[in-house]
Amino acid sequence: MKRNFNISGMLEEFPNISLLDIHYYGLKGYGIDFDSEHGERPKFHIWDLNSLFSVVPMQPDITSPYTFKSDTLTFNGEELPFNVQFVKWIKGVPSYFYYRNIDEWIQTIDNEIVLTTNFQQRCKGCSFCCRDLQDKLSNITPKKGMDLVMKDRQDFYNIGELAVVTGMFRDEDTTINHLSEVTNIARNKGFNGHLFYIGTQVRTEKGIQRLLDNLNGVPLRYSYALETFIKREELHPLKVLPLDEIVDTVRMLKQSGVWKMEYGYMPGIDNLESFYQNACKFKDIARPHVSIFRPINAEQSKLVSDDCQSDPVRYLCKMREHFEKLYGCPIYGNNLGNLWTFPINRINPIFMTGEPPNGR
């Protein structure tokens, strides 16, 4: 049986949220019913006059009101009233690095070019991770990883953000050494942007000061990988700390000189009551780095809160409204699972042509 929701009712209840964004939450919350012979997933760009978003379902969902069939994406059997571009089928091939830019047909705020590295593939630190790469990629050193990056480029002058998803290292010192070496290699090749670290392992005053000293003026954006307020024992079995201790740690990191302090958060896991009770604790010290939770199997589906499972669009609208109330504005970002879609006036207009370069 198909699940469904009332579009007009949502627009009436949330008058400040657009029809495009309502459908964005619908696609995130209900998924897409599609056929794939080889485990591939469809990628779409969808936009109107004001906003654009990308969506890639994690797995087919036969209960979804959204269906992709015969190259057409529909809602309850009708085409969406927007520009809809089917980009390509995603194979989910693991990689040590990737770019967010025009060449990869991934939009970014203000046309920033982002290089994301993940040289620590064999991790198993978080139960929510969507990739199981134990038998596919091994851990490699920063030098070997950056050598792979340099095979296709001469320098790093045009890279605005160097993002490092570290995985779980042996200890804080090893994490700092990795971040420092990756950044220094890039800087020696002309990098003059900022470092974006997503993780939890740099969390002492001594450690953060050593990292900042090693970066030697490179601004640090740090997203502390919290993900949930109340189910951290299930998602982070190897790195659980009491929430109040995490709040104190994030405050210390910010006061130590971190350029932009954030905390990773995944809507879909916490119930709304717990979200309302705890989001305010970070208001004055960090912004959320949001990525809507999308389970990839039955086991992960157990992590979805009853609030989200029963009414995902209303749930996501309420979270968005509360974040905007706390911070006074939308929280735009380059993460494709954000609660806020990309403003048209802040992305490259080429994305509205529907013509990926080189047939990508």
Go through each PLM region and give its residues.
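Short, electropositive alpha-helical surface patch
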Residues: I176-N184, P219-S223, L272-H289, I344-R360
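Short acidic, glycine/proline-rich loop/turn micro-motifs
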Residues: E233-P237, Q300-S305
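Core AdoMet radical
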Residues: C130-G207, V218-I246, K260-G264, H289-S291
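C-terminal accessory extensions appended to soluble enzyme cores
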Residues: M1-D21, G26, C280, R294, ...
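Short acidic active-site motifs
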Residues: K206-R210, S274
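Conserved C-terminal portion of the radical SAM core fold
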Residues: G217-T228, D244-V304, V313-N335
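Canonical Radical SAM [4Fe-4S] cluster-binding loop centered on the CxxxCxxC motif
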Residues: W105-K144
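Flexible, acidic/Gly-rich N-terminal and inter-domain linker regions that tether
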Residues: M1-E112
